[in-house]
C-alpha cells in the first residue's frame, strides 16, 4: 500500500487518514434530500353583482444541494363587479416577496475531492485546504465564510372596464402595471483562496416598472341566421423602464467583518449605473366570418412598433388568412354515424420577432479611463455602430390541419403539416477588424422550417365506475439555412479552375447553407487504436489506446477534408404519452411519459485526456484502454487528443417518466358531516425515471435534475 500511495502522490494527511480508516464522503456532505413545501389558502364568493377571490400562499423550498434554498410569500385579490347592465369593472392584483440567501456547497469541488482529507480543523473550524496542498478548496468553505442577501418584490395589477354598446358592439379597456424591486448583496471572504486580502463585496440595487394598455372594440352580428360576422379592433401601447446601481469594493480595512454592510471600508471602490427604457405600440384588425357554422374564414392585419429598431423601420406589418371547412356538417357525411367531427383547416400568415437588445440599433458610448500627464480622466468612445435600417424579423408560414372525432368522440385528435420561412433574421454580423468594431446588429439570411404534429386522444374505458383516457402527441421538425450574408465565393474544380460561384458559409458560427442551423460538421470518432495497429497509428501521430478518427479520403492525414455531417443538436422527433385513470369517482392515477429522439451532443469522457486526472482527485468514472482491456470505445489514460482536437458525439435520445400522480377524493357523504365541501389527498413524483445511453447528466438539460416527491392536501370548506 505504501508503494500505491507514493504513485498516487498522497500527502501526509492523506496517508494518515488512509491508515486510520478515516474516509470523507464529500458527495454526502454537499447533497441532501430536497424538500419543497407549498401552502395556500383562498376565499371566494359572490353577491348579486360582485365576484371576489382572495388568496395567500407561502413556499419553502430546499434543493438537493446543501445551501440551496428559496422562500416566497404571495397574495392575490381578484374582483369583478357589474356596475350596470352595460358596464363591468374588475381588478386583479398580486404581490410576491421572494428571498434566497442561499450559498450553495461547491459540488464541482466535491466531485474532484480526495476522500482522505479533513473537513474541519481540530478546533472545529472549517478547514480551508482539506489536504494541506493547493488542490481544490473545501467544498463547504464558501458556506462558512461568505455572506449573501437576495430579495425581490413584485407587484402586478390589472384594471379593466367593459362596456356593452348597442348594435352588438362591446368595448373593453385593460390597464396593466408592474413594479419590481431587487436587492442583491454578496461578500467574498478572504479566507477563501484567491480572494484579495480583506475580502470583496458587491451591492446591486435594481428596480423596474412597466405598463401596458389594451383597448379592444368587438362587434358580433348574425344575419339571416346563417351569416355570422365577428370583428375585432385592438390598439395597444406599452412602456418599460429599469434602473440599476452597482457598487463594488475590495481590500476591506482593518478587515471584512462588516461584510457588504460596510462596503465603504474597502480601498478600491467602483460604482456603475445602468438605466434602460423601451416602448412599443400596435394595431390589430381581425374579421371572422362563418356561413352556417360550416364554412369559416378569418383575416387579420396587425401593425406593431418597437423602439429598439432602426429609425427607418420601427414598424412591422403582419397579415394572416385562414379558412376552415366542417366537413362533418355536410349532407354526404351526416349519415356516417362513426364520424362525429371532421374539420379541414388551411392558413397562411406572418409573425414578427423583436427579440433584440433595447439599444441594438443605436450607436452606444462606453466610459473609459484616459491617463494624461499622470492624471486619470474619464472619457467616452463609440463602442458600437448604429443600424438605422434594422427591422423586424418576419416568419411566413403555411399550415394545413385536420381535426377529427370518431366513434362518439371516443377517438379524437388532429394532424398538422406546416412549412415556415423566416427572413431578415436578427443577428450580430462580424465587422472587419479595420473598422474598429467587433459586430453590428443586422437583418441577415433566410431559414426554412417544416414539420408535422399529431395528437391522438382516446377514451379507452368509460363505465359508471371506471374511466380511462390517454393522449399521444408526436412532432417532427427540420430546418435548413437557405441564405446567409450574400457574400459570394468562387467554386473550383479539381484542377483549381473557377467553374462558378456560391454563397459563402459562416464557418466560425458553424452555419452552412443547405444544412440545419445546429447541424454538426466535425470529425467522426470510430474508436481506439489497438495493438497490432502501431504502424498505421503512427502515420497520424498516434499509438494504441489513442482516439481514432475516420480518414474519409484515406490520404494518411486528418484535416478539414475528413469532416462529415454527423447529426443535429436538437431532436428530430418528440413524443408524449399521457394517461388518466379514474376509479369509482374518487381514486385518480395519471402519468406523463416523454421522449425525444434523433439528436446528439458532445460527450468527451471516453477521451480520458491527462488533465482529468491529478493525483487523488476524482472524476466521473469511465473505463479506459489498456493492453489487457483493449476496448474499442474508451481511450487510454492520458490519451493524445491533439492534432486535430477530438470531440466525441453521443446520442441524447431518452425516455422519461415526466410525472406520476395518485390522488384520493373523499366521498361528499362522508365529509359533509364535518362541514367540509371537498377533501383530497395526493402524491406526485416528477422525473420518476429516465432511460437513456447519455451518461454524464440529464440528457435533456445536461445538468443534474432531481426527482421531486410532492404530498398534497386540498380542503374546501
Predicted feature residues:
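Predominantly transmembrane beta-strands of Gram-negative outer membrane beta-barrel pores used
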Residues: 30, 38-60, 64, 76-82, ...
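Extracellular/periplasmic, surface-exposed regions of secreted and cell-surface proteins
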Residues: 37, 72, 78-87, 92-97, ...
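Glycine-rich, aromatic-lined ligand/substrate-binding cores of catalytic
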Residues: 569-602
Amino acid at each position: 500500500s505504501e508503494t500505491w500511495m507514493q504513485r498516487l502522490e498522497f500527502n501526509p494527511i492523506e496517508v494518515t487518514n488512509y491508515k486510520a480508516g478515516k474516509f470523507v464522503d464529500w458527495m454526502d456532505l454537499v447533497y441532501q434530500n430536497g424538500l419543497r413545501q407549498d401552502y395556500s389558502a383562498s376565499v371566494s364568493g359572490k353577491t348579486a353583482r360582485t365576484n371576489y377571490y382572495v388568496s395567500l400562499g407561502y413556499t419553502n423550498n430546499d434543493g438537493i444541494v446543501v445551501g440551496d434554498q428559496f422562500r416566497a410569500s404571495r397574495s392575490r385579490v381578484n374582483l369583478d363587479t357589474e356596475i350596470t347592465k352595460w358596464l363591468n369593472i374588475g381588478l386583479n392584483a398580486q404581490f410576491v416577496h421572494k428571498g434566497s440567501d442561499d450559498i450553495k456547497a461547491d459540488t464541482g469541488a466535491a466531485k474532484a475531492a480526495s476522500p482522505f482529507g479533513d473537513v474541519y480543523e481540530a478546533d472545529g473550524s472549517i478547514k480551508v485546504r482539506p489536504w494541506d496542498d493547493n488542490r481544490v478548496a473545501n467544498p463547504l468553505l464558501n458556506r462558512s465564510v461568505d455572506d449573501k442577501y437576495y430579495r425581490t418584490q413584485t407587484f402586478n395589477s390589472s384594471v379593466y372596464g367593459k362596456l356593452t354598446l348597442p348594435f352588438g358592439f362591446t368595448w373593453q379597456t385593460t390597464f396593466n402595471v408592474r413594479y419590481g424591486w431587487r436587492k442583491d448583496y454578496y461578500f467574498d471572504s478572504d479566507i477563501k483562496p484567491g480572494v484579495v486580502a480583506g475580502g470583496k463585496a458587491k451591492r446591486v440595487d435594481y428596480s423596474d416598472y412597466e405598463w401596458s394598455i389594451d383597448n379592444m372594440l368587438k362587434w358580433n352580428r348574425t344575419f339571416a341566421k346563417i351569416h355570422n360576422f365577428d370583428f375585432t379592433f385592438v390598439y395597444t401601447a406599452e412602456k418599460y423602464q429599469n434602473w440599476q446601481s452597482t457598487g463594488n469594493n475590495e481590500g476591506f480595512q482593518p478587515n471584512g467583518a462588516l461584510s457588504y454592510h460596510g462596503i465603504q471600508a474597502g480601498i478600491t471602490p467602483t460604482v456603475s449605473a445602468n438605466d434602460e427604457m423601451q416602448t412599443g405600440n400596435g394595431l390589430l384588425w381581425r374579421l371572422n366570418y362563418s356561413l352556417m357554422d360550416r364554412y369559416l374564414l378569418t383575416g387579420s392585419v396587425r401593425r406593431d412598433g418597437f423602439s429598439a429598431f432602426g429609425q427607418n423601420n420601427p414598424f412591422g406589418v403582419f397579415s394572416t388568412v385562414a379558412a376552415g371547412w366542417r366537413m362533418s356538417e355536410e349532407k354526404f357525411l351526416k349519415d356516417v354515424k362513426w364520424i362525429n367531427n371532421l374539420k379541414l383547416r388551411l392558413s397562411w400568415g406572418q409573425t414578427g420577432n423583436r427579440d433584440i437588445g433595447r439599444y441594438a440599433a443605436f450607436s452606444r458610448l462606453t466610459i473609459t479611463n484616459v491617463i494624461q500627464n499622470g492624471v486619470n480622466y474619464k472619457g467616452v468612445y463609440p463602442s458600437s455602430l448604429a443600424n438605422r435600417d434594422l427591422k423586424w424579423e418576419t416568419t411566413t408560414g403555411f399550415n394545413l390541419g385536420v381535426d377529427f372525432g370518431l366513434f362518439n368522440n371516443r377517438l379524437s385528435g388532429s394532424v398538422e403539416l406546416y412549412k415556415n420561412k423566416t427572413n431578415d433574421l436578427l443577428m450580430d454580423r462580424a465587422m472587419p477588424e479595420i473598422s474598429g468594431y467587433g459586430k453590428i446588429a443586422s437583418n441577415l439570411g433566410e431559414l426554412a422550417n417544416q414539420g408535422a404534429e399529431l395528437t391522438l386522444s382516446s377514451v379507452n374505458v368509460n363505465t359508471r365506475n371506471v374511466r380511462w383516457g390517454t393522449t399521444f402527441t408526436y412532432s417532427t421538425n427540420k430546418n435548413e439555412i437557405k441564405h446567409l450574408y450574400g457574400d459570394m465565393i468562387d467554386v473550383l474544380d479539381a484542377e483549381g479552375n473557377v467553374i462558378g460561384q456560391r454563397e459563402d458559409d459562416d464557418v466560425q458560427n458553424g452555419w452552412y447553407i443547405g444544412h440545419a442551423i445546429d447541424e454538426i460538421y466535425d470529425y467522426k470518432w470510430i474508436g481506439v487504436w489497438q495493438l497490432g495497429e502501431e504502424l498505421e497509428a503512427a502515420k497520424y501521430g498516434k499509438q494504441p489506446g489513442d482516439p481514432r478518427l475516420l480518414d474519409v479520403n484515406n490520404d494518411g492525414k486528418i484535416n478539414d477534408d475528413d469532416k462529415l455531417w454527423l447529426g443535429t443538436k436538437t431532436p428530430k422527433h418528440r413524443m408524449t404519452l399521457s394517461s388518466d385513470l379514474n376509479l369509482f369517482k374518487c381514486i385518480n392515477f395519471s402519468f406523463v411519459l416523454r421522449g425525444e429522439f434523433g439528436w446528439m451532443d458532445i460527450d468527451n469522457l471516453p477521451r480520458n485526456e491527462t488533465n482529468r486526472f491529478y493525483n487523488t482527485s476524482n472524476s466521473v468514472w469511465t473505463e479506459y484502454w489498456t493492453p489487457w482491456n483493449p476496448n474499442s470505445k474508451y481511450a487510454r489514460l492520458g490519451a493524445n487528443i491533439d492534432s486535430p482536437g477530438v470531440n466525441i458525439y453521443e446520442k441524447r435520445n431518452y425516455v422519461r417518466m415526466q410525472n406520476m400522480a395518485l390522488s384520493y377524493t373523499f366521498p361528499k357523504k362522508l365529509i359533509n358531516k364535518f362541514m367540509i365541501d371537498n377533501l383530497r389527498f395526493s402524491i406526485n413524483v416528477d422525473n420518476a425515471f429516465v432511460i437513456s445511453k447519455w451518461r454524464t447528466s440529464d440528457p435533456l438539460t445536461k445538468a443534474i435534475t432531481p426527482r421531486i416527491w410532492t404530498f398534497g392536501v386540498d380542503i374546501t370548506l
